[in-house]
Amino acid sequence: MFRPSIKFKQSTLSIIARRLKSSAQHQPLRSSFVPSPIVFVAGLAVAAVGGYYCLDSRSAIHEYVLCPLIRTFTDAESGHKLGIFFMKYGLSPRLLDDGKNDQSDVLGVQVFGHKLKNPIGLAAGLDKDGEAIESLFNCGFSYVEIGSITPEPQPGNPQPRFFRLPKDDAVINRYGFNSSGHFNVLATLKLRFNKLLNKFGTSHSSEQHPFSNAFQQGKLLGINLGKNKFGDEVNDYVKGVERLGPYADVLVINVSSPNTPGLRDLQSEAKLTNLLTTVVKERNVLGKNLLGNKPPVLVKVAPDLTEPEIESIANSAKEAKVDGIIISNTTIQRPVDRLLTTDKQLINQAGGLSGKPLKPLSLKALRTLRKYTKDSDLVLIGCGGISNGKDALEFGKAGATFIELYTAFAYKGPGLVGKIRDELAEELRKEGKTWEQIIGSDDK
């Protein structure tokens, strides 16, 4: 058998090596990639479009990807804190057409001496310490309410104290007025106020200056006041008016959280009249806030009230000369006939229920309250279970001058505000009316 010699093998290998070297000198290296200018520009364009898409709060990625991911990988309270963290540092999306296509021709509403762009507000409880005000306004809210804020810092109830009912788009919370206290929030508000005042400047004309603590045209900042667990049932609120009133467009007296022992007892007529009368007197002593406006006083009440109790609240509000009533807070009821959640241990957690199952209760309470206040100047604010434009319209027709969201916003993400705004405007245009024209129209 023929066996090639070692010399032959070496000769053959050297020839192959020379040919490969020659080929390499004339062929481009295919393993190296140098992007052409077109590819580079296209990449930048894709990144820019993607970034713009994610910055728009109404992008589907927020409702259908990011919010579900947060719910999957965090418990309810951790998810809450994460959301506030992102908003605090400006890492959250915004409603990009809030300035141009704001639907204010249909949705604008005159309230407390201001013209709101739309009747959509944020309820207290989300931003407890006023850390994310700008980002929340940038979502499209015309009214943002921070708090509840107590005089002294307190941790609230032990954890776990916040529970999701995802099948019902609902939550149960028993936070218990966890708050960093008046002075810590005051420091945050002062820093924000001075920063924005310097940025805005003092030389603007009245037409240009918003003259509200929102520092945005057609928007207002509300501050919700609570009492410490073992605090005085009157003086705790008076301190809040005195300390935080200068930075508020609206002051809210919260007597309806179910998670502070004895708090709801303040809704009885004698106690409530005394409390609200004292608070209004303190507001009058305070006079105007730092931007020259006297902040109106509202009281926030529960949905778990009988008709006589609602009537007595209306009487107290009129006698004390407060400016309005927010109805309602969370409910201690568990309407099992409307709940899809079947886990009894979860359903029976102590605390207040909010979200979609609350809507029938809060809407009924609003209609009842309207019955006893329509002969007055009291402004009613609807809150509880609102998650779309049709819900908002129902509350408006029942007597709400504007409405507030919280739980639906947490579930659906920042795009919900723009979605409700556009849905509500569409419903009103179908009827050929504006928001102001339909307020309380159910009782005509």
Swiss-Prot record:
Listed GO biological process terms: 'de novo' pyrimidine nucleobase biosynthetic process; 'de novo' UMP biosynthetic process; pyrimidine ribonucleotide biosynthetic process
Pfam families linked: DHO_dh
GO cellular component: mitochondrial inner membrane
Catalyzed reactions: (S)-dihydroorotate + a quinone = orotate + a quinol
EC number: 1.3.5.2
Superkingdom as given in the UniProt entry: Eukaryota
Cofactor details (free text): Binds 1 FMN per subunit.
Single GO molecular function: dihydroorotate dehydrogenase (quinone) activity
Cofactor names: FMN
Residues noted as binding FMN in the record, renumbered to the chain: A124, G125, L126, D127, K128, S148, N224, N254, K300, S328, G355, G385, Y406, T407
Pathway: Pyrimidine metabolism; UMP biosynthesis via de novo pathway; orotate from (S)-dihydroorotate (quinone route): step 1/1
Positions of substrate binding: K128, N173, R174, Y175, G176, F177, N254, V255, S256, S257, P258, N259, N329, T330
Subcellular location: Mitochondrion inner membrane
Activity dependence on pH, as recorded: Optimum pH is 8.0-8.5.
Active-site residues, record numbering mapped to chain: S257
Membrane topology: Single-pass membrane protein
Function comment: In the de novo pyrimidine biosynthesis pathway, catalyzes the stereospecific oxidation of (S)-dihydroorotate to orotate with reduction of flavin and the transfer of electrons to ubiquinone, which is part of the respiratory chain. Does not use fumarate and NAD as electron acceptors.
NCBIfam families for the chain: PRK05286.2-5, pyrD_sub2
Protein name: Dihydroorotate dehydrogenase (quinone), mitochondrial
Organism for this UniProt entry: Candida albicans (strain SC5314 / ATCC MYA-2876) (Yeast)
Taxonomic lineage of the native organism: Eukaryota, Fungi, Dikarya, Ascomycota, Saccharomycotina
